[in-house]
Every structure is written in structure tokens, then in C-alpha cells.
Amino acid sequence: PFEFHHIESNHPRYVMSYHWHVEYEIIRILKGSLTVTLNEKSFIAMPGDIIFVHSGILHSGIPDDCVYQCIVFDGNFFLKNNSACAGYIQKILHQEIMIYHHFSPKHPDICDVVNSLFDALWKKPVGYEMTVIGQFYHFFGLVFGNHYYLESVSRTRRDYKRILQLKQVLDFIEHNYASPLTLQQLSASVSMSPKYFCRF
């Protein structure tokens, strides 16, 4: 249920191109810097920083002499066989709350737990599976206990529509990448004129 990636300059996906997925993702920066874009907002993540990417968020990362790691996971995993925590997890899955997307070493509680989580998946000592699951619950517990989230997030209809259109274009490119693509085709995939699409 957990996909782990260690990414250095020789990795085929060193530059994290703009993409999205239904799974959640946690990124930690080990060295250098990573210019992270979430939807249409960018910031620079430095060594020791932790980035939390919600389900469905368009995101990319431009590395600068960077070594970073990612864990991609299905949030529904945490609903199984654990009714005591289900109410909290559902708030995350239903986007009633949005966990802060950027934690720095100024949040040592979060950094310690997330670093332990990454180290367990990276080094895989005996029993690491229990450490991983336990540290995920520990992370969520800290998020709720310290209010490291935004409540009842409302996206403006205009912003929501733009993000939806960006996702449609990315899907179109992904499904037709083997063929030459024209501006006309890209703009038509989101029902726009080529002129307006270029300003989009």
C-alpha cells in the first residue's frame, strides 16, 4: 500500500513533471532544494522540509542539486480494520480538512515522525511494516492534536474550474503523447479557443 522512491540526479524522473493522482504523497528533502508547485502556487523546499500532497492536487518539483524521497499512499488503507480512527481519516479523505502542505524543521514533532517513517521504508529493518503504519497514525495524530490543518476549505468556482481544465489537458497529453499534438487539439480538449488557451 506504500510506494517509496529515492530520487537523485540520475533518476529517470529526477524532475517531477506536473501531474496528479488520487493517492496522497509525502516528500522529504535530503539535500539541495526543490521548487514545488501545488496547483498553481510555488515555494522552495529545503533540506529537512516535509511536503504533504493531498489527493487530486496538481503538483510538480524542479530540483536544484536535490536529493529527495517520496511516499505515495492510498488514504483508504487507514480506514480498514480501525474504526477508532475512521472519523479522523474520513475528514482527510472527504477534504473537510486540508493538512498543511509544508512542514519545516520548525515542526520537530512532525519531522521526527515523518523521518522515522521514511527511514523504515528506505532501510526496511525487520518489522518495518509495523513502524510504517504506526508512524503514519502518529503523523495523523499530531496533525489533529496540533491543528496542523485548514478547516472547511472552499475553492472558488473559478479556481476549481481552472484546475479541472489543467487536469483534462494533462490527461489528453498522457493518452496521446505518441502522436504529434497541435494547439488546436489541446485547446479543443478543454473546449477553448487556441487564443484563449495560450493565455490560460
Regions found by a protein language model. Give the residues of each.
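A hydrophobic/aromatic-rich effector-binding and dimerization subdomain
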Residues: P1-I7, L58-W122, G141-L150
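Generic protein-terminus/edge-of-domain signal
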Residues: P1-M46, I50, P63-D65, C85-Y88, ...
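Short, Lys/Arg-enriched N-terminal segment that forms or immediately precedes the first helix
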Residues: N10, L150-R157
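Regular secondary-structure segments
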Residues: L30, C111-P125, L170, E174-Y177
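Residue-level recognition of conserved beta-strand edge/terminus positions
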Residues: H54-G56
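N-terminal positioning helix adjacent to the helix-turn-helix/winged-helix DNA-binding module
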Residues: D109, R158-V169
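All-alpha amphipathic helical-bundle segments outside canonical DNA-binding/catalytic cores
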Residues: L121-H138, Y160
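Basic/polar phosphate-binding segments, predominantly the helix-turn-helix DNA-binding elements
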Residues: G145-Y148, Q168, F172-F200
